[in-house]
């Protein structure tokens, strides 16, 4: 780890995770959700391939915060019965965790000498760390949402990393004798055909399967995935890397040329591609590489 909030990956990327609270697709108004979507999309459109965003939607046990009524009384009996019913229902809170990654796009030219190499390494890290914190600050203050930075010291960040294997989001302390990767990957996983078996690291042995979404609908809307019934046993993951606006037009021209040479392009498709390139250059449309997976636990 670089500090209490920022982690350096094996490929020298820097990442920081935020828990987003206060808004969801079920209880929030359509106008509020649409405004948040537009603001977030505008931020993504101003960035390029140096940044990647991961959004995880998962569940954790809800904390009711109800003070118990002690003693033998009618109110106490009702309170005990109500508490037992809440425990039976196993209430869950929906959690959104946004991870911002400042990637190392080009290989870093490091001198051979130790002091010079350390200086170049330190300057590059400081520059990318400043850019990462700047984007995180915009997310925290410019979108009108409540966020909480996940930290190693309180166990929230390590617990989040570990939950991606187990599906159980809970705080996990940092071990002073292990690498962060070892703390995050403490579960024992056996891979089988079409799924995995989690033998250790979770409260009970579990099975999991990862579904990769490769065909997209013609239109989407905020909250459309909230209809998944088994919410507490699923993790929905989005990964998005923006593409620089200046390269869109060149990519469109190259794609059209390839389709023309293969005689596999219609006039309407060609027109749509050039229209999209014009919108990208004018700032009305953004492009990026998106991946989506759904992990189901049982």
Enumerate the predicted regions with their spans:
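Extended, folded cores of ATP/NTP-driven motor/assembly subunits in large transport
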Residues: 1-298
């Amino acid at each position: 780890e670089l500090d209490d909030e920022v982690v350096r990956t094996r490929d020298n990327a820097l990442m920081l995770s935020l828990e987003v609270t206060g808004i969801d697709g079920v209880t929030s108004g359509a106008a509020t959700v649409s405004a948040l979507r537009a603001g977030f999309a505008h931020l993504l459109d101003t960035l390029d391939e140096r940044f990647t965003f991961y959004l995880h939607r998962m569940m954790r046990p809800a904390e009711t915060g109800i003070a118990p009524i002690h003693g033998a009384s009618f109110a106490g009996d009702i309170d005990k019965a109500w508490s037992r019913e809440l425990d039976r229902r196993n209430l869950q809170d929906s959690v959104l965790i946004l991870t911002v990654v400042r990637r190392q796009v080009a290989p870093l030219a490091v001198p051979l000498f130790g002091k010079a190499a350390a200086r170049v390494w330190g300057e590059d890290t400081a520059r990318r760390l400043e850019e990462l914190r700047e984007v995180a600050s915009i997310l925290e203050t410019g979108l009108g949402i409540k966020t909480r930075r996940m930290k190693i010291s309180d166990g929230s960040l390590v617990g989040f990393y570990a939950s991606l294997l187990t599906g159980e989001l809970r705080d996990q302390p940092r071990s002073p004798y292990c690498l962060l990767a070892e703390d995050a990957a403490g579960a024992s996983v056996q891979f089988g055909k079409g799924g995995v078996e989690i033998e250790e690291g979770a409260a009970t042995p579990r099975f999991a399967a990862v579904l990769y979404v490769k065909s997209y609908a013609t239109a989407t809307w905020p909250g459309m995935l909230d209809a998944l019934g088994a919410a507490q046993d699923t993790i929905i993951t989005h990964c998005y890397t923006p593409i620089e606006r200046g390269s869109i037009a060149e990519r469109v021209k190259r794609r059209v040329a390839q389709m023309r040479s293969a005689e596999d392009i219609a006039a309407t498709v060609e027109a749509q591609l050039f229209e999209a390139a014009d919108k990208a250059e004018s700032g009305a449309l953004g492009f990026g590489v998106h991946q989506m997976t759904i992990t189901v636990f049982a």
